[in-house]
Amino acid sequence: MKALLVLGFLLLSASVQAKIYERCQFARTLKRNGMSGYYGVSLADWVCLAQHESNYNTQARNYNPGDQSTDYGIFQINSRYWCNDGKTPRAKNACGIPCSALLQDDITQAIQCAKRVVRDPQGIRAWVAWQRHCKNRDLSGYIRNCGV
Amino acid sequence: MVWLVAMTSRQRSLCGLAAHGLWFLGLVLLMDATARPANHSFSRERAANRDENEIIPPDHLNGVKLEMDGHLNKDFHQEVFLGKDMDGFDEDSEPRRSRRKLMVIFSKVDVNTDRRISAKEMQHWIMEKTAEHFQEAVKENKLHFRAVDPDGDGHVSWDEYKVKFLASKGHNEREIADAIKNHEELKVDEETQEVLGNLRDRWYQADNPPADLLLTEDEFLSFLHPEHSRGMLKFMVKEIVRDLDQDGDKQLSLPEFISLPVGTVENQQGQDIDDNWVKDRKKEFEELIDSNHDGIVTMEELENYMDPMNEYNALNEAKQMIAIADENQNHHLEPEEILKYSEFFTGSKLMDYARNVHEEF
């Protein structure tokens, strides 16, 4: 039994390596950082978007062979336009940050960058997953019972 | 992308300006400002989560090891283990319920009820789940086909599809239909033009004789889901090889398969990301795709690797899945091993593992 308990603790410690937010935890963090209604985008929109982009995994990374860019973090923000990873051709870095900043457990910088993205004319439509899963849907379930 | 709509409406308001220079400057600034998607998640959308009226062939196909864009399908293990029940193991759901569900699956896989899973049993299960994904695709295809065949004559032409595709990209459906009817050049951006070209190639490939560019419902299914059509699977393989093949010899070397973009990585974390990506692809290349281990992947090898109904692949996959969780190395899976490695099988940790097992004893 002791061995199993030790195993359990090891599992717990292993899970700390990659910060994966719980849905409501994420919603509260967003609200605390002024995301509710930012540029007309509701909290539920942001939660829905992040679930479909990264399943709330702060260290999600996906490479895009097409333009040799990479999408980083809980919002899957792209290195071609928004951040610098030192290896993306024709990069712009509109958020003025290294892409590694988007992978941190503390998602403050990722939120600031997401705000910058949504201030562009296309707004939240910059996120394909939002268009395909969240647009014109009833999103109340994404923040249900979160107290936000 | 929808940003074209914004440009169109903005262009109208700019037409009133007298100075052409200002109009051009505005256009250039607008193009630069609006053509910046947050990411390219399009290529990674799960097929199971597609909208009902989805008419664009997905890059991601459930139960297929490589995406259409050459990425490894990181959800493959869960897809062939869970079948269409992939959404039942959300992080939010209670651990006890997830555990019970996992044990129900275990008892189904364990055909001879000896309380452990053999490679043969897992292989059989994988084949069953893969077929399940295909049945799901057939069902979805009826809806998609109905969306592109509104007159219900059982055929959809390339021109009809093009109208629907561009409408789904935010273009005005009537304007597009008129332009096509009058053989006018379509005003679409470069990226959409390229996608259309690829789609047209696939359309040609899916169009069985007679070559009339009209697709039936079955042909449309192979257009959206090439993995279960021999001809379309070959086409898919050819596309992937073409994308990755740098020296043009129509096969893939290890460097080609794992190639990363040139450039200096800025820090150690970036280097770690690259290393992980390369390591995963190298392992897949050497251990699985290159079946004769000669350092070269031919189109035939890649096709065998991607064929979801290949029995040899399913057995290999079964052995691989068992090996990952088989702690006592008896080449079988016991209930406690599956529970401990639940994240590998379901994509979701069972955080109360220790407590649950304690209660079981």
Curated annotation (Swiss-Prot), chain A:
<dbReference type="GO" id="GO:0016798">
    <property type="term" value="F:hydrolase activity, acting on glycosyl bonds"/>
</dbReference>
<keyword id="KW-0378">Hydrolase</keyword>
<dbReference type="InterPro" id="IPR023346">
    <property type="entry name" value="Lysozyme-like_dom_sf"/>
</dbReference>
<feature type="domain" description="C-type lysozyme">
    <location>
        <begin position="19"/>
        <end position="148"/>
    </location>
</feature>
<dbReference type="GO" id="GO:0042802">
    <property type="term" value="F:identical protein binding"/>
</dbReference>
<dbReference type="GO" id="GO:0050829">
    <property type="term" value="P:defense response to Gram-negative bacterium"/>
</dbReference>
<dbReference type="GO" id="GO:0000137">
    <property type="term" value="C:Golgi cis cisterna"/>
</dbReference>
<comment type="similarity">
    <text>Belongs to the glycosyl hydrolase 22 family.</text>
</comment>
<feature type="disulfide bond">
    <location>
        <begin position="24"/>
        <end position="146"/>
    </location>
</feature>
<protein>
    <recommendedName>
        <fullName>Lysozyme C-1</fullName>
        <ecNumber>3.2.1.17</ecNumber>
    </recommendedName>
</protein>
<dbReference type="InterPro" id="IPR000974">
    <property type="entry name" value="Glyco_hydro_22_lys"/>
</dbReference>
<feature type="disulfide bond">
    <location>
        <begin position="83"/>
        <end position="99"/>
    </location>
</feature>
<keyword id="KW-1015">Disulfide bond</keyword>
<dbReference type="GO" id="GO:0005788">
    <property type="term" value="C:endoplasmic reticulum lumen"/>
</dbReference>
<feature type="disulfide bond">
    <location>
        <begin position="95"/>
        <end position="113"/>
    </location>
</feature>
<dbReference type="GO" id="GO:0005795">
    <property type="term" value="C:Golgi stack"/>
</dbReference>
<dbReference type="GO" id="GO:0048237">
    <property type="term" value="C:rough endoplasmic reticulum lumen"/>
</dbReference>
<dbReference type="GO" id="GO:0031640">
    <property type="term" value="P:killing of cells of another organism"/>
</dbReference>
<comment type="function">
    <text>Lysozymes have primarily a bacteriolytic function; those in tissues and body fluids are associated with the monocyte-macrophage system and enhance the activity of immunoagents. In the intestine they may also have a digestive function.</text>
</comment>
<feature type="active site">
    <location>
        <position position="53"/>
    </location>
</feature>
<dbReference type="GO" id="GO:0005902">
    <property type="term" value="C:microvillus"/>
</dbReference>
<feature type="active site">
    <location>
        <position position="71"/>
    </location>
</feature>
From Swiss-Prot, chain B:
<feature type="region of interest" description="Necessary for intracellular retention in Golgi apparatus lumen">
    <location>
        <begin position="308"/>
        <end position="361"/>
    </location>
</feature>
<feature type="modified residue" description="Phosphothreonine">
    <location>
        <position position="216"/>
    </location>
</feature>
<feature type="binding site">
    <location>
        <position position="110"/>
    </location>
    <ligand>
        <name>Ca(2+) 1</name>
    </ligand>
</feature>
<feature type="binding site">
    <location>
        <position position="294"/>
    </location>
    <ligand>
        <name>Ca(2+) 5</name>
    </ligand>
</feature>
<feature type="modified residue" description="Phosphothreonine">
    <location>
        <position position="264"/>
    </location>
</feature>
<dbReference type="GO" id="GO:0005783">
    <property type="term" value="C:endoplasmic reticulum"/>
</dbReference>
<feature type="binding site">
    <location>
        <position position="249"/>
    </location>
    <ligand>
        <name>Ca(2+) 4</name>
    </ligand>
</feature>
<dbReference type="InterPro" id="IPR018247">
    <property type="entry name" value="EF_Hand_1_Ca_BS"/>
</dbReference>
<feature type="domain" description="EF-hand 1">
    <location>
        <begin position="97"/>
        <end position="132"/>
    </location>
</feature>
<feature type="domain" description="EF-hand 2">
    <location>
        <begin position="136"/>
        <end position="171"/>
    </location>
</feature>
<keyword id="KW-0597">Phosphoprotein</keyword>
<feature type="binding site">
    <location>
        <position position="332"/>
    </location>
    <ligand>
        <name>Ca(2+) 6</name>
    </ligand>
</feature>
<feature type="binding site">
    <location>
        <position position="160"/>
    </location>
    <ligand>
        <name>Ca(2+) 2</name>
    </ligand>
</feature>
<feature type="binding site">
    <location>
        <position position="326"/>
    </location>
    <ligand>
        <name>Ca(2+) 6</name>
    </ligand>
</feature>
<keyword id="KW-0732">Signal</keyword>
<feature type="binding site">
    <location>
        <position position="290"/>
    </location>
    <ligand>
        <name>Ca(2+) 5</name>
    </ligand>
</feature>
<dbReference type="GO" id="GO:0021549">
    <property type="term" value="P:cerebellum development"/>
</dbReference>
<keyword id="KW-0106">Calcium</keyword>
<feature type="binding site">
    <location>
        <position position="337"/>
    </location>
    <ligand>
        <name>Ca(2+) 6</name>
    </ligand>
</feature>
<feature type="modified residue" description="Phosphoserine">
    <location>
        <position position="98"/>
    </location>
</feature>
<keyword id="KW-0677">Repeat</keyword>
<keyword id="KW-0325">Glycoprotein</keyword>
